[in-house]
Structures are given as structure tokens and as C-alpha cells.
Curated annotation (Swiss-Prot):
Biased composition (Basic and acidic residues): 1372-1382
TSP type-1 domain sequence ranges: 309-362, 364-417, 419-472, 475-528
Name listed for the protein in its UniProt record: Adhesion G protein-coupled receptor B2
Spans annotated as Disordered: 229-271, 767-806, 1359-1385, 1423-1454, 1498-1585
Keywords of the record: Cell membrane, Disulfide bond, G-protein coupled receptor, Glycoprotein, Membrane, Phosphoprotein, Proteoglycan, Receptor, Repeat, Secreted, Signal, Transducer, Transmembrane, Transmembrane helix
Domain GAIN-B intervals: 757-924
Low complexity bias (residue ranges): 229-238, 769-780
Organism: Homo sapiens
Gene name of the encoded protein: ADGRB2
Parts forming coiled coils: none
Length: 1585
């Protein structure tokens, strides 16, 4: 059990009741039961002061029980105990104290029996004195006679034992004895006693004096009790360092001494205790005491002083000089431990002083920075520039500077001016003196004949001497010259002037001889030209004034920072001045300055715990500031200083940072060394080598964390830019070799897992230095607690050299730290040119320092971050060099073993920071971001040109090739074009963080959209194959799939990641870490799989019987079909496509889409995969070349498949060129006229289909669909399959709902005059150019009521041409017959001509010809068509125009296209919208029956065996219904009129009824082998109409 308390709160366990306690004690004593240690022992820690009784200390009050008190730090604290004598406790339990170095849980305190004592005495014969002393370490508390016994310990643990025999203990103690507080404990700081501890000691001394009759003294430093000035008082002095290395454990007062002599002495005033002490014996008067002194926190091998400010710890000894030669620095620190009863600490916690070593360091010669380029040597024409640098001379045998001192280069200025001519000299001026000799001057002017800026060669003025009268003698003299004035010009030869005064005045003339003024030229350098001056500029809220090239201008920092910014005016190679980048190395943001002030406030706190918690808050705030990524280069240097103070404070306060604090600390370092800060670090290097200081801070913090670890414990910290491994191993038993990094650890970053960097540290390297040999590194000494006998305290002459122990203690540990930096090589000071850091940087640090092996054993493998380098060298960082800013890489410590394409292996001798130095390629810069590479530009440009060509062709012929497939293709091309443009934009190095993030997000969107549009094309082909009509809703779904699905994926990814991972410092694409890349790879893979599935389904559909137009393939496939399915109805010109069968155009388009997906989709996947690799790894030329090849091939393939190989585009181009097919009629939807492609719109196709469709209806067969069902499928559900053709039970026919390839097997008809069976007589609707007509067979059978599905929806005004003869409309026309009313068997002419809107039968011709099949009459009867009459074509109805244009009519109207003529033909059609209600269907059905025209008059032919072409045509379709046989000229009109009134039975007898029921004599209609119907119209017919 462990108990912690404050101010007396120790472990306390009160028994439930005295009766229960007595029962337990009696049982244990009766059976001689030894109590279990877990139930009889207690451990207390953290007790500063307390007074305890038996029931407070022991869980179970019994003999053998123990109570152990822990000293938190024996080097700094001491335990003071006062034992208050109580007779019952002493008599029954004989308490004694045992000072222990280690706590033993199962240790028993029972006194050994006499037999065991004898055996123990025999075993102790021959034991050394140390073991005897340890055996006699127990102190009997009741051996003295006084009321108090004082004890002083500096051990780790003090154990209080009840050591009496069980038989001697009573069954029950008195309650007063149980509650008597017989032990008082006080924990005192040896060097900083608080007021409370001194007050307790003073009270003890006062009580001791009252009991003894005289004063008692305590030799405790820093404590003084009031009233101690008497003679008997003990003065308090500070003890010096111990004179001996090993002292005894404790001091107790002598047994026989009187109570008045019970004084407590400190460890420094006692002699060695060498006599043996056994149980029951009195201790000697001079017992021995073992004292341990506190050590320095920074230097564990040195002892700390014990004098100084009582409110703070003493200063530690000065550390070893930081340099082995020359002038270095020494540091000493102190920490403050304050209790609530003490005062706060004041003053600094760290001091630094310079130190000079006797050894002189060799100083190599160092070049200073190059000076600025001089102005051109000539003001015009071609000259030269030069610049110089100065070499700091070497000292003490250092190397001289290498390299040139002067550099020159050519310069070209403006053309030199034309030399002018001097004019005549002017007159001489006056003499300069009035007496004696003087000078005269004259001048001349330059005549400029050329440009205004031409000059003349020669002097402008001329001077000569002049003689005057002698000056009179005077006694005056000149005074001293004053200082020269400022130059009148800063350049281009100005002048300076100085004066002197005449000190005396003569009687006549000028008082002094000579002149009192002197003038001399100055600033002879040429003034910079206009192009050599930097203009005024306003950048970042700062105004930079104009300056000449080479000058540095200083300015205030931006408003959000304090300090000064600088900027240099530079000169380009062409001689033009320009401003360099501003330097903000001396600018510090307000937030960072406030954070530093809060750091100072935490440092001012005296208590360690508060200071440690304050540092945790500082690290948390610093992480939040750096995460914003808005800071200056000066903020980075300031952050390094903050981290150094945090590390020192953690170390001084002995505060163990938590795991979160450690993670935040290294996360801050990761933010600072990020590659985005390379330019900031380059700027900061001009002021201070902050990256080198950061490297040292990281190493110190690693060892701070490692000291808090347990033995064999390790810690791994992983961030975006560095990986840290920390482990603690005992010095005497290092477990195994060290390998770093462990790539298989959980949480490891991808850049570490895939890297080839490796460290191998054999355990032979981990050995301490030999005795007396100085340490070889600046690491701290061994963290052992005690000083071994082989160590010697530092003397005055060896204060800066630390000696390691010869035999390390078992408690000494190695702290091994390894760090792999991802980007540190970019920010460390670079080596001398032409070398550069071409690998990652790895740091290895071990403390205490190890002995360097005789040969290199440390193996390091470092992978390259720059490809194409040459001459690699392994190097280590050398801290001993004086100037760290010039580059401290040392290549002599490591050997380069092996160089491969991906990494280099090194072997080094010393532990340090390692890297590979090599010469980078000449055409490679170390910039992580730059302009796009040439392969990327070529690939994107070729692909964009191909796609733009495709878009231009489609835009030119859009009205001819507009379709769903074309729209999908255009969206697909736009997504690829946008992707190529964004790839090029993302490679630019001028993008900001926000623009790069947006570029990555849009790239993600367009990459996914390109895949989705390929999937949309597959979906469209699938819908075309299954024959489902695409409504506008389906088209909107196309857009949702193509653009909506990628937008949803990108929105979800951005929302979850908060744009983290969209764009990195190296590229503008999805980050390869964190799993964000799966947001693109996952959907793309799913789309590819779904596309493959749809492709397989479409292919199976096309290979089925309805999807193959080739008859041979169908026969091989063994599919059965209706025998009449290969025939075509006479209305093939309508362009209708049968709904249950797939048209050849749809099959062709579906096959083209399938083939396009199979070719484009794999190429698209390869292109974007290579694009991702090329963007993420710019150094790889292979990936960029692959992307260029795949991207170019993708553009060409898309253009070829969808443009050059597409049939629609080919037809458009042919028709534009005038190459048209001659076998197509004028009215064909795909025919060409006058070089133009005549393509019907969806509306005109619907009208053409409605007017030229033939519908066969039968009672007991399939339910035929309406035109509404044919066009828009409104009457059928979308998922309902169309009905197939069937054969009736008696051989009757059943057809598909709409026109198709139908073969009509004609059954045998009854004889003439016999009525046919009603079930075999079906109403026949024939179509012409003007509309539909019904061959009325109602006189053979009554018409049955038709269902709502047995009708066709036709326009209200189907025909507007009226017959030329009588029988017009008007009131005499019969009304429409109600549905279901039977008609009479015969009809008169009046009945036939009673419909005003239809043509009578005399305007139609019925013929049999080769076009629609042949018919042989076995009875020798012929059928003569009626002669043409000028009824419909020549006599139009008043107010209505003709529907057709004869081909023989000349004029400009013939030049109209077929499209215009069809629009004219259907211009006055008024279609009603189809409704989904039964009422509207019924009305349309009745209207349809009213407008059908009935055929009742036909003429007979006299010729028996003549082949006839028969057709039913309206007057408006004469060009396609011309009979092959013309009537004889002599035929009488009466005969024609008679034949016109012939009944239908006669016609049936001569034609259909006369054929025998043999297959070879069946009526054969025109086959569809040469007919290719157009595609079914897309869209909703009801909505479009």
C-alpha cells in the first residue's frame, strides 16, 4: 500500500472495532502466524511533516509489521525523525528503524530467535566490515532513557518496524497507547530550509530544552531560532563538502547519556561508526553517518555548491567550455524549489560567461561575400563590370582562401554619342589677385551637330598666370584651414570647399598673401544611369525609396510585426537594376513577441511545477501559431529561441513533459523545417544560423525525454517531416544492435515506410570511455546517483574536464536518440560549391558519450532526394568549427562504401548528423516547385489540339449530328481539356497555398468527371439496346452522373479533410499521405468495373436475335423468329422503327459506343495514372514521358473514334462535298438534295410516322399499340416488354404493335360472293402522303367494339384536299357511326363519298408490281387500276394549298430542300396532346373512325395474266403511287364509272380469294433488305408536340 500526504496526511488505517482487532491478534499469536507483508506493511511517500500513532501507521498492529517512509531525493533532502517514548509501545513492540537504499515489499521485521541468532553469528564469521555494518544498521528507538530520540537520515527509505516477539505482545493495548503520536517526521531541504521547517526544528529544540533543563541545538544550515544568543546555544553554520566518500547511515543519541545531551548532529560533524551494533545493544556515542550531496542538473558528475540565496538553489558549477580551442562559452544554471511557507525566487536561472582555452584553433581563410558589381567601365558602347571579395587571412596554420578574388563580365551600354566641335575660345577673365602673381581663365563652347547628347573631347576651360604689382609687406598670417565641406554631388564629379581666416590686418591692400578658399573635385565616379536605379515601390504595406544598384534600404516592418526589414537593389546580367526580395529576418510578429513575454512570466514563477506547466502552455500556443503558416523569417529564429528556453526550463525544474507535450514539441519542429519555409530559412541565415541551433535544441530535448523513460523502454514520435526514436538502455547490458527506422511500426508515415534510409548501430559502439579519458562529445555525464570510488572530485585546475567512472554503476543508462529529417538538408547551411545536400539528413545522439571505436562501425544508408547527381560523398556535421554559417559539413569522418541509383551507404566513426553531399545536375535547381516540364507541356498541348479539332468539327455540323451521344462526347472532351489546363497550372511555382488547394480540388473533380462521362456513354448505349425511350428526365440523369457524382465525391472529401491534403509544398494534387488519394482511386476503379459490366451486357444484347441484322449470324445462333418478320410494310418511307425490334441504326450506334468505351477507357486510366505519377515526382523523366505519350494518344484516339470513324460525321462531310447516294428518294429522311443533308427533326419524324404508318388489327391476336405507344410509350409502363408476334389458332396473323418487317401468309379465300369468316377479315389501314385510309370491310362483318388500346391517335385535320366530283360535305354528309353499331353489307356511292375530309376511291390506284411483290391469278382474271383522274391533284380545296410539289414543275421552288418541303407539308397539322386518361383516348378513337375513308369501288381488268403494281395513294402522293399500266385511250367513262362502283366481294374474289393456300403462292410484300429505318425519335412526343 502506498500513501502520500501533506502536512501530516500519511497512511492511516483504523480497525473496525477493538473487539475484532483483539480476536485477530489472539488468533495470530496463538497459532504463531506470520502476517502477510501485503496486509502488515505500508509505504508512505510525499510526506513533508506529520505526527503519527500506531493506528495511523500500521494497517495491522502486530509484531513484524513495518511502515516505510520514502525520501524523494536523498541528494537534496534529509529526513528528520523525533521518537516520543511511550512505555507500552516500547515494552510490547520494541520499535526500531532501518535505513534502506531499496524498498523490499516482502521484508519482515521480526527479531530472529536465539537459535537463528547463533546461526546468523556463525555465518557472519569472515564477512567483510561493510556487511557487518549493514547487518547492524537497525536502530532501537527505546534503548535510550530520555523522552525524545532524534534521528537524521539521508537514505532513500526509512523503515519503522515492530520487532518484538509475538509471545511478548499483549492481546490488547490501551486506547491511549494506540492513539499516542510517538513518531514525528520532517522533510528538510539541505540547502534551502523554509520558515516552516525551521519553525518545527526550533520547537523540537525548545521542547528538548525544557525536558532536559538546558538548551538543545541542531546544526541545520539556514535556520536560526529566537533567543539562541546564549552561551549554550548552537550556532548554525553551513556545512562544507564531505571529507570522506562513505559515511554511516544515521545518528542516534547515546543510550546512557542524559536527556539533556540528546543533540542532533548533521552528517558533516560526525565521525565514522565502525563498531558492530546488534539487537538489544546500546549504540556507541560516535555512530557513523553516510551523507550524499546534491549534484548539478546539467553536469551529473559534479557536485553543486551549498551556499547562496536561501530562497533558491545554488548555482551549478560552470560547464565545460563549449570549444576545445579559442574562446568559447561556459554555462551554469540553478533551479528554485519553494514551498508554500517559503518565498519566491528572484534573479536569473542561467548565466553565461566566456572562456579562453590555452590551445589555439587553426583558423582557415574565409572569403567574405562578393561585393556588388561595379558600374560599366564605359558610359556608352561595350565595356566590362567587375566585383571583388576579400579573404580573411588564415591564422595559426589555417588554410588559405581558394578561388578567384576578382570576377569580371562584359556589359553593353547605349551607343556612344557623336563627338562635337569646339567653338572659339572666349576672352581671358580677370586676374585672381590684385597684387603679385595670380591666374586667369577662359572658356569655350561645344558645337553639337549631331544628337543633343553629343559631347566634345578636350578641356572646357584654359588657365594662365597673370602678373600684378608687388603687394605691400604686412605682418598678417593665415589661420588654419577648416574642414572640407560636403561634396556638391554624390556622383559624376562634384566639388568640395574649405576656408581659412586671416589672423592679422595690414595697413595697405590685402592683409594676407594668398587665398582664403580652396576647392577640390570629389565623387568622381559616374552617376548611375536611369536603368541602373531601382524605382520607388510599394510592397507589403511598405514604401521602398529609389536606390542605386548595390545599395541596401532599411524600412520598418509591416504593421503586424516589429523590427526592421531590409531590401537590396540588385543588378541583372543585362545591366538593369531591380529590387531583390525583402528580408524579414529582423521582423518579429506581435503574436510571437507576446508568447515570449508569457514565457518570461512563467520563468519568473518560483515553483517548478508551475514553471513546467507554463512551458506546456507555451508549446501548445507555439504549435497553434505555426500551424497558421503565416509568419516571417524572424519568427522562425524567435521560435528556436523559445524552444531552447522551454527545454532548459524543463531540465532545470526536473519536470517530466507528458506525451502530448512531447508530440507538440516535435510537431512544432516539423512545422519549422517544412520545405515551404526554405526561402525563409535562407533569409534567416543572413542574421543567425538558426537551423543549426534548432538541431542542438532537438538533441537536448531528446535526452530530456529519454531521462524520464524506464529501462528498456522506447518512444517513437512520427510527424510529417521528421521521425524520432528514443530509447533507454542500461550501460552494463545493452540489449541488441540499434536499427532505425522501424518501418513496420503502426502509425508510420508513407514517406518513411517507402524510403530506403537506414541506420545500423552495433552494440559494441555503446561502451563508455576508459578511466580518466575525457569524453569525446558534449553530452551530459552518467546519470548515476552516487559517485563511485574511482571518481575524483574536480579540482581547481580541472574544472572544465569531466571524467567518467571506471566501473559504471548498474543504475547508469544510455539515452539513445535517432532522428530522420525529411527536409532539414534544404535549410542547413549549404556546403561549398559545387556540392549540395542531395539526401535526407539523419541524426544519432547518445548520452553519456561513448568511446569512439577504433574503426568505423556505424552504418548509414541515405536515399537521394535529387536524381542525376554525381560524385557523392558521405558527410557529417561538425559542431567544433567556429563559423557555423559557412557550412560545417565534414567528409573526413565517414567513408563512402557503396553508391547505387537510389541510395548511398556510408560507414562513420563518430555519432553525429549524417547526409550525402554530391554535385547536382547543371540544369537542376533545388527549387521544389517550378515551371512545368517540357514533356508535360507537349503532352497536354497535343491532347488539347486534338480535342479542339473535334469540338470545331462538331460545332460546324451540330445541327446535322445533334444527339445524346454527341452531347455526352462534348462534355467528356470538356472535362479532359479542363484537366490538361489544370495540370499545367498546378506545376507553376507562383501559386499561393489557397490557389494550389483549389487547383488540386478541381483536378480531382475533372479527373473523376472524365471517368463518369465514359460511364454515361455506356449507360446511353445500354438504354438504346434495350429499346427504352429517353425522356428529359433520363437526360437530366445523364448530367447528374457526369457532373453531379464527381462533385459529390469532391465535396465529401473536402468536408471531411477540411482541405488538408489538397495540395502540398511540392505539387498541387492529392497528398499521398493520409489516404486522401483513395478518394480518386476508389471511385475511378468502381466506374471502370461498372463500365465493363455494362459493356458485357450491351454486347450480349447485340449478339441476341433482336440485336443482329445479319441473317447468317442469326441462323448460326439458332434463334427462332417469325417467318414474316423479314418483310416490310408499304409505309417504309415513314422512317418508323418497330418498337419490339432493335433498328440497325441503334445497333450500329450501340456497337460504336461499346467499341469507343473499350478503347478510350483503358487509355484514359493509363493517362491519368501516369499524370498522377508525373505530378507527384517531377524528378522522374520516365513518368513525364509516359504521360506525354498516353495523353497525346488519348486525344488522337478520341478524335479518330468520334469524328473520323463515325458514320454520321462521314455522311455530313460527304453531303457537304456533294457526294450523295443516288438510290435514295427525295423524301427519305437521310437523302441528299442539292448537296445538303436532309434530316428530319424529331417533330417531323413523329408527324411522318403518324401519317404513313399501317396498322393491321386482329381480334384474337396481340394488342397493337397506338401511335402514342410507338412514339413516346405513354400508354405502356417503362418496364413493360413489348409483345411479340403470334399466330392465331386458325392460321390468322398477329402482328407487332407498329410497322415492322412483316410477312403476311395469305390463307385461302372463299369463292366469289361468299362472305369471308368474320374472324379472318381484319380492317386494313393504308397510308399515303396525305394521311391514313381504311379499307372498309365492314360489309363483310360487323365492326366489334374496340378497346382503348386498339386505336391510333391521328391529327384532327388529316387531309384537306376534297374530291373534284360531287358528293361534297355539307349537311348531307352522314354523321359518324356510333362505336359498335354494325354496318350494312353494301354501301352506295353516296355513302362512300359522304366524308368531306377524305378522298374518294376514284382518286386512288390499286396495282400489283415488282416493288411490293407479284401476284399470279390462277383463274385468268386481271385487275385493271382506274385511269388517273384530275380530281385531287388538279382541283384543290379552296383556301388550302397543295401538299406536294410535282418533280416536273420548273421554277425556283424546286431548289427548296426536302426539309423545307416537309415543313410545308405538315405546316397546318394541329396535333392534340396525348392525355393519360381513358376519356381522352375514347374521344380520339371515335374521331379516328370518323375520318377513315372506305374503299367500295374498284374496276376489273380484262387481261388475265399481267403483273400489276398496286398501291393506295392519296392525291397528295402522286410521285410515289404511279401505276405501271395505263388505261386504254378508248375506254369509255361509263365503264370506268361502272368499275368504280364494283363491290368489294368482286375485288376479293379476283385477288385474295382466288389464291390457293400454298406458301409459294402467298402474297409477298416488299422485303426490307434495302431499307434502313432511321433511329426512333428521342424525347417525349407529348411534350415536344
Amino acid at each position: 500500500m502506498e500513501n502520500t500526504g501533506w502536512m501530516g496526511k500519511g497512511h492511516r488505517m483504523t480497525p473496525a472495532c477493538p473487539l475484532l482487532l483483539s480476536v485477530i491478534l489472539s488468533l495470530r499469536l496463538a497459532t504463531a502466524f506470520d502476517p502477510a507483508p501485503s496486509a502488515c506493511s505500508a509505504l508512505a511517500s510525499g510526506v513533508l511533516y506529520g505526527a503519527f500513532s500506531l493506528q495511523d501507521l500500521f494497517p495491522t498492529i502486530a509484531s513484524g509489521c513495518s511502515w516505510t517512509l520514502e525520501n524523494p531525493d536523498p541528494t537534496k533532502y534529509s529526513l528528520y525523525l523525533r521518537f516520543n517514548r511511550q512505555e507500552q509501545v516500547c515494552a510490547h513492540f520494541a520499535p526500531r528503524l532501518l535505513p534502506l537504499d531499496h524498498y523490499l515489499v516482502n521484508f519482515t521485521c521480526l527479531r530472529p530467535s536465539p537459535e537463528e541468532a547463533v546461526a546468523q553469528a556463525e555465518s557472519e564469521v569472515g564477512r567483510p566490515e561493510e556487511e557487518e555494518a549493514e547487518a547492524a544498521a537497525g536502530l532501537e528507538l527505546c534503548s535510550g532513557s530520555g523522552p525524545f530520540t532524534f534521528l537524521h537520515f539521508d537514505k532513500n527509505f526509512v523503515q519503522l518496524c515492530l520487532s518484538a516477539e509475538p509471545s511478548e505482545a499483549p492481546r490488547l493495548l490501551a486506547p491511549a497507547a494506540l492513539a499516542f503520536r510517538f513518531v514525528e517526521v520532517l522533510l528538510i531541504n539541505n540547502n534551502n530550509s523554509s520558515q516552516f521547517t525551521c519553525g518545527v526544528l526550533c520547537r523540537w529544540s525548545e521542547e528538548c530544552g525544557r525536558a532536559a533543563g538546558r538548551a538543545c541545538g541542531f546544526a541545520q544550515p539556514g535556520c536560526s531560532c529566537p533567543g539562541e544568543a546564549g552561551a549554550g546555544s548552537t550556532t548554525t553554520t553551513s556545512p562544507g563538502p564531505p571529507a570522506a566518500h562513505t559515511l554511516s547511515n544515521a545518528l542516534v543519541p547515546g543510550g546512557p547519556a542524559p536527556p539533556a545531551e540528546a543533540d542532533l548532529h548533521s552528517g558533516s560533524s560526525n565521525d565514522l561508526f565502525t563498531t558492530e551494533m546488534r539487537y538489544g545493544e546500546e549504540p556507541e556515542e560516535e555512530p557513523k553517518v553516510k551523507t550524499q550531496w546534491p549534484r548539478s542538473a546539467d553536469e551529473p558528475g559534479l557536485y553543486m555548491a551549498q551556499t547562496g540565496d536561501p530562497a533558491a538553489e545554488e548555482w551549478s558549477p560552470w560547464s565545460v567550455c563549449s570549444l576545445t580551442c579559442g574562446q568559447g562559452l561556459q554555462v551554469r544554471t540553478r533551479s528554485c524549489v519553494s514551498s508554500p511557507y517559503g518565498t519566491l525566487c528572484s534573479g536569473p536561472l542561467r548565466e553565461t560567461r566566456p572562456c579562453n582555452n590555452s590551445a589555439t584553433c587553426p583558423v582557415h581563410g574565409v572569403w567574405e561575400e562578393w561585393g556588388s558589381w561595379s558600374l560599366c567601365s564605359r558610359s556608352c558602347g561595350r565595356g566590362s563590370r567587375s566585383r571583388m571579395r576579400t579573404c580573411v587571412p588564415p591564422q595559426h596554420g589555417g588554410k588559405a582562401c581558394e578561388g578567384p578574388e576578382l570576377q569580371t563580365k562584359l556589359c553593353s551600354m547605349a551607343a556612344c554619342p557623336v563627338e562635337g566641335q569646339w567653338l572659339e575660345w572666349g576672352p581671358w577673365g580677370p586676374c585672381s589677385t590684385s597684387c603679385a602673381n595670380g591666374t586667369q581663365q577662359r572658356s569655350r563652347k561645344c558645337s553639337v551637330a549631331g544628337p543633343a547628347w553629343a559631347t566634345c573631347t578636350g578641356a572646357l576651360t584654359d588657365t594662365r598666370e597673370c602678373s600684378n604689382l608687388e603687394c605691400p609687406a604686412t605682418d598678417s598670417k593665415w589661420g588654419p584651414w577648416n574642414a572640407w565641406s560636403l561634396c556638391s554631388k554624390t556622383c559624376d564629379t562634384g566639388w568640395q570647399r574649405r576656408f581659412r581666416m586671416c589672423q592679422a590686418t595690414g595697413t595697405q591692400g590685402y592683409p594676407c598673401e594668398g587665398t582664403g578658399e580652396e576647392v577640390k573635385p570629389c565623387s568622381e565616379k559616374r552617376c548611375p544611369a536611369f536603368h541602373e536605379m531601382c524605382r520607388d515601390e510599394y510592397v507589403m504595406l511598405m514604401t521602398w525609396k529609389k536606390a542605386a544598384a548595390g545599395e541596401i534600404i532599411y524600412n520598418k516592418c509591416p504593421p503586424n510585426a516589429s523590427g526592421s526589414a531590409s531590401r537590396r537593389c540588385l543588378l541583372s546580367a543585362q545591366g538593369v537594376a531591380y529590387w531583390g526580395l525583402p528580408s524579414f529576418a529582423r521582423c518579429i510578429s506581435h503574436e510571437y513577441r507576446y508568447l515570449y513575454l508569457s514565457l518570461r512570466e512563467h520563468l519568473a514563477k518560483g515553483q517548478r511545477m508551475l514553471a513546467g506547466e507554463g512551458m506546456s502552455q507555451v508549446v501548445r500556443s507555439l504549435q497553434e501559431l505555426l500551424a497558421r503558416r503565416t509568419y516571417y523569417s524572424g519568427d522562425l529564429l524567435f521560435s528556436v529561441d523559445i524552444l531552447r528556453n522551454v527545454t532548459d526550463t524543463f531540465k532545470r525544474a526536473t519536470y517530466v513533459p507528458s506525451a502530448d507535450d512531447v508530440q507538440r514539441f516535435f510537431q512544432v519542429v516539423s512545422f519549422m523545417v517544412d520545405a515551404e519555409n526554405k526561402e525563409k530559412w535562407d533569409d534567416a541565415q543572413q542574421v543567425s544560423p538558426g537551423s543549426v541551433h534548432l538541431l542542438r535544441v532537438v538533441e537536448d530535448f531528446i535526452h530530456l525525454v529519454g531521462d524520464a523513460l524506464k529501462a528498456f523502454q522506447s518512444s517513437l514520435i512520427v510527424t510529417d517531416n521528421l521521425v524520432i526514436s528514443i530509447q533507454r538502455e542500461p550501460v552494463s547490458a545493452v540489449s541488441s544492435d540499434i536499427t532505425f527506422p522501424m518501418r513496420g511500426r503502426r502509425g508510420m508515415k508513407d514517406w518513411v515506410r517507402h524510403s530506403e534510409d537506414r541506420l545500423f548501430l552495433p552494440k559494441e559502439v555503446l561502451s563508455l570511455s576508459s578511466p580518466g579519458k575525457p569524453a569525446t562529445s558534449g553530452a551530459a555525464g552518467s546519470p548515476g546517483r552516487g559517485r563511485g570510488p574511482g571518481t575524483v572530485p574536480p579540482g581547481p585546475g580541472h574544472s572544465h574536464q569531466r571524467l567518467l567512472p571506471a566501473d559504471p554503476d548498474e543504475s547508469s543508462y544510455f539515452v539513445i536518440g535517432a532522428v530522420l529529417y525529411r527536409t532539414l538538408g534544404l535549410i542547413l547551411p549549404p556546403p561549398r560549391p559545387p556540392l549540395a545536400v542531395t539526401s535526407r539528413v539523419m541524426t544519432v545522439t547518445v548520452r553519456p558519450p561513448t568511446q569512439p571505436p577504433a574503426e568505423p562501425l556505424i552504418t548509414v544508408e541515405l536515399s537521394y532526394i535529387i536524381n542525376g547527381t554525381t560524385d557523392p560523398h558521405c558527410a557529417s556535421w561538425d559542431y567544433s568549427r567556429a563559423d557555423a554559417s559557412s557550412g560545417d559539413w565534414d567528409t573526413e569522418n565517414c567513408q563512402t562504401l557503396e553508391t547505387q541509383a537510389a541510395h548511398t551507404r556510408c560507414q562513420c566513426q563518430h555519432l553525429s548528423t549524417f547526409a550525402v553531399l554530391a554535385q547536382p545536375p547543371k540544369d537542376l535547381t533545388l527549387e521544389l516547385a517550378g515551371s512545368p516540364s517540357v514533356p508535360l507541356v507537349i503532352g497536354c498541348a497535343v491532347s488539347c489540339m486534338a480535342l479542339l479539332t473535334l469540338l470545331a468539327i462538331y460545332a460546324a455540323f451540330w445541327r446535322f449530328i445533334k444527339s445524346e451521344r454527341s452531347i455526352i462526347l462534348l462534355n467528356f472532351c470538356l472535362s479532359i481539356l479542363a484537366s490538361n489546363i489544370l495540370i499545367l497550372v498546378g506545376q507553376s511555382r507562383v501559386l499561393s497555398k489557397g490557389v494550389c488547394t483549389m487547383t488540386a480540388a478541381f483536378l480531382h473533380f475533372f479527373f473523376l468527371s472524365s471517368f463518369c462521362w465514359v460511364l454515361t456513354e455506356a449507360w446511353q448505349s445500354y438504354l438504346a439496346v434495350i429499346g427504352r425511350m429517353r425522356t428529359r428526365l433520363v437526360r437530366k440523369r445523364f448530367l447528374c452522373l457526369g457532373w453531379g457524382l464527381p462533385a459529390l465525391v469532391v465535396a465529401v472529401s473536402v468536408g471531411f479533410t477540411r482541405t488538408k491534403g489538397y495540395g502540398t509544398s511540392s505539387y498541387c494534387w492529392l497528398s499521398l499521405e493520409g489516404g486522401l488519394l483513395y478518394a480518386f482511386v476508389g471511385p475511378a476503379a468502381v466506374i471502370v468495373l461498372v463500365n465493363m459490366l455494362i459493356g458485357i451486357i450491351v454486347f450480349n444484347k447485340l449478339m441476341a436475335r433482336d440485336g443482329i441484322s445479319d441473317k447468317s449470324k442469326k441462323q448460326r445462333a439458332g434463334s427462332e423468329r417469325c417467318p414474316w418478320a423479314s418483310l416490310l410494310l408499304p409505309c417504309s418511307a415513314c422512317g418508323a422503327v418497330p418498337s419490339p425490334l432493335l433498328s440497325s441504326a441503334s445497333a450500329r450506334n450501340a456497337m460504336a459506343s461499346l467499341w469507343s468505351s473499350c478503347v478510350v477507357l483503358p487509355l484514359l486510366a493509363l493517362t491519368w495514372m501516369s499524370a498522377v505519377l508525373a505530378m507527384t515526382d517531377r524528378r522522374s523523366v520516365l513518368f513525364q514521358a509516359l504521360f506525354a505519350v498516353f495523353n497525346s494518344a488519348q486525344g488522337f484516339v478520341i478524335t479518330a473514334v468520334h469524328c473520323f470513324l463515325r458514320r454520321e460525321v462521314q455522311d455530313v462531310v460527304k453531303c457537304q462535298m456533294g457526294v450523295c447516294r443516288a438510290d435514295e428518294s427525295e423524301d427519305s429522311p437521310d437523302s441528299c438534295k442539292n448537296g445538303q443533308l436532309q434530316i428530319l427533326s424529331d417533330f417531323e419524324k413523329d408527324v411522318d410516322l403518324a401519317c404513313q404508318t399501317v396498322l393491321f388489327k386482329e381480334v384474337n391476336t396481340c394488342n397493337p399499340s397506338t401511335i402514342t405507344g410507338t412514339l413516346s410509350r405513354l400508354s405502356l409502363d417503362e418496364d413493360e416488354e413489348p409483345k411479340s408476334c403470334l399466330v392465331g389458332p386458325e392460321g390468322s396473323l398477329s402482328f407487332s404493335p407498329l410497322p415492322g418487317n412483316i410477312l403476311v401468309p395469305m390463307a385461302a379465300s372463299p369463292g366469289l360472293g361468299e362472305p369471308p369468316p368474320p374472324q379472318e377479315a381484319n380492317p386494313v389501314y393504308m397510308c399515303g402522303e396525305g394521311g391514313l385510309r381504311q379499307l372498309d370491310l365492314t360489309w363483310l362483318r360487323p365492326t366489334e367494339p374496340g378497346s382503348e388500346g386498339d386505336y391510333m391517335v391521328l391529327p384532327r385535320r388529316t387531309l384537306s384536299l376534297q374530291p373534284g366530283g360531287g358528293g361534297g360535305g355539307g349537311e348531307d354528309a352522314p354523321r359518324a357511326r356510333p362505336e359498335g353499331t354494325p354496318r350494312r353489307a353494301a354501301k352506295t356511292v353516296a355513302h362512300t363519298e359522304g366524308y368531306p375530309s377524305f378522298l374518294s376511291v376514284d382518286h386512288s390506284g390499286l396495282g400489283l408490281g415488282p416493288a411490293y411483290g407479284s401476284l399470279q391469278n390462277p383463274y385468268g382474271m386481271t385487275f385493271q387500276p382506274p385511269p388517273p383522274t384530275p380530281s385531287a391533284r388538279q382541283v384543290p380545296e379552296p383556301g388550302e394549298r397543295s401538299r406536294t410539289m410535282p418533280r416536273t414543275v420548273p421554277g425556283s421552288t424546286m431548289k427548296m430542300g426536302s426539309l423545307e418541303r416537309k415543313k410545308l407539308r405538315y405546316s397546318d397539322l394541329d396535333f392534340e396532346k396525348v392525355m393519360h386518361t381513358r376519356k381522352r383516348h375514347s374521344e380520339l378513337y371515335h374521331e379516328l373512325n370518323q375520318k377513315f375513308h372506305t374503299f367500295d369501288r374498284y374496276r376489273s381488268q380484262s387481261t388475265a395474266k399481267r403483273e400489276k403494281r398496286w398501291s393506295v395513294s392519296s392525291g397528295g402522293a402522286a410521285e410515289r403511287s404511279v401505276c405501271t399500266d395505263k388505261p386504254s385511250p378508248g375506254e369509255r367513262p361509263s365503264l370506268s364509272q361502272h368499275r368504280r362502283h364494283q363491290s368489294w366481294s368482286t375485288f376479293k374474289s379476283m385477288t385474295l380469294g382466288s389464291l390457293p393456300p400454298k406458301p409459294r403462292e402467298r402474297l409477298t410484300l416488299h422485303r426490307a433488305a434495302a431499307w434502313e429505318p432511321t433511329e426512333p425519335p428521342d424525347g417525349d412526343f407529348q411534350t415536344e408536340v
